[in-house]
Curated annotation (Swiss-Prot):
This is Elongation factor P-like protein. It comes from Serratia proteamaculans (strain 568). PANTHER family: ELONGATION FACTOR P (PTHR30053), TRANSLATION ELONGATION FACTOR KOW-LIKE DOMAIN-CONTAINING PROTEIN (PTHR30053:SF14). InterPro entries: Elong-fact-P_C, NA-bd_OB-fold, Rib_uL2_dom2, Transl_elong_fac_P/YeiP, Transl_elong_KOW-like, Transl_elong_p-like_YeiP, Transl_elong_P/YeiP_cen, Transl_elong_P/YeiP_CS. GO terms for cellular component: cytoplasm. NCBIfam families: PRK00529.1, PRK04542.1, yeiP.
């Protein structure tokens, strides 16, 4: 059991007889005094795969489910299935393309260290990515000298097809660090 304000992305809860996996959380702080903070959570139903959206107050009690996490690496693609291999015992975990469509935008061709598969009683639930990823810009408008003084942004496309807003001074070929959950530019990568 946990309060709604303690729930994080990637956790699983049991709610209204459904097993739900937290995909995204929006925090809404009301301006009125005495009003409680609302947590708008987007889930995916583990059994049906459908998307579910619910709102909770910060002190609402939710029934959390403990999941097992296994470190994995991307192995290969077999048609519409993506195979990830367990780092320790080499167990293959198979995902259909539509199950992990959003996550695929953040997995470069060389792979992404720190990925985990979430399982419950042997059933594969989701692929969890690390907080950040380093990627190379493949397409953007040319960099403008002296643009570091302004805070304007421009769209940049990565090799995976992901498009995010980056500062004007960056150009194609630059490596950048991206915050995965917020889909935003953080800094240049080392």
């Amino acid at each position: 059991m946990a309060k709604a304000n303690e729930i994080k992305r990637g956790m699983a809860i049991s709610y209204n007889g459904k097993l739900l996996l937290v995909r995204d959380i929006d925090v809404q702080s009301p301006s009125a005094r005495g009003a409680s903070t609302l947590y708008k959570m987007r889930f995916s139903d583990v059994r049906t795969g459908l998307k579910v959206e619910e709102r909770f107050k910060g002190d609402d009690i939710l029934d959390t489910i403990s999941l097992s996490r296994r470190k994995v690496n991307f192995s290969y693609i077999d048609g519409e299935e993506y195979v990830f291999m367990d780092d320790e015992d080499y167990t293959p975990y198979i995902f259909k393309k539509d199950q992990i469509e959003d996550e695929l935008l953040f997995i470069p061709e060389a792979g992404l260290p720190g990925m985990q598969v979430l399982t419950l009683e042997g059933q594969v639930l989701a692929l969890e990515l690390p907080q950040t990823v380093d990627m190379e810009i493949v397409d953007t408008a040319p960099g403008i000298k002296g643009a570091s003084a302004s805070a304007r942004n421009k769209p940049a496309t990565m090799a995976t097809g992901l498009t995010i807003q980056v500062p004007e001074y960056l150009s194609a070929g630059d490596k950048i660090r991206i915050h995965i959950a917020e889909r935003r530019y953080m800094s240049r990568a080392d």
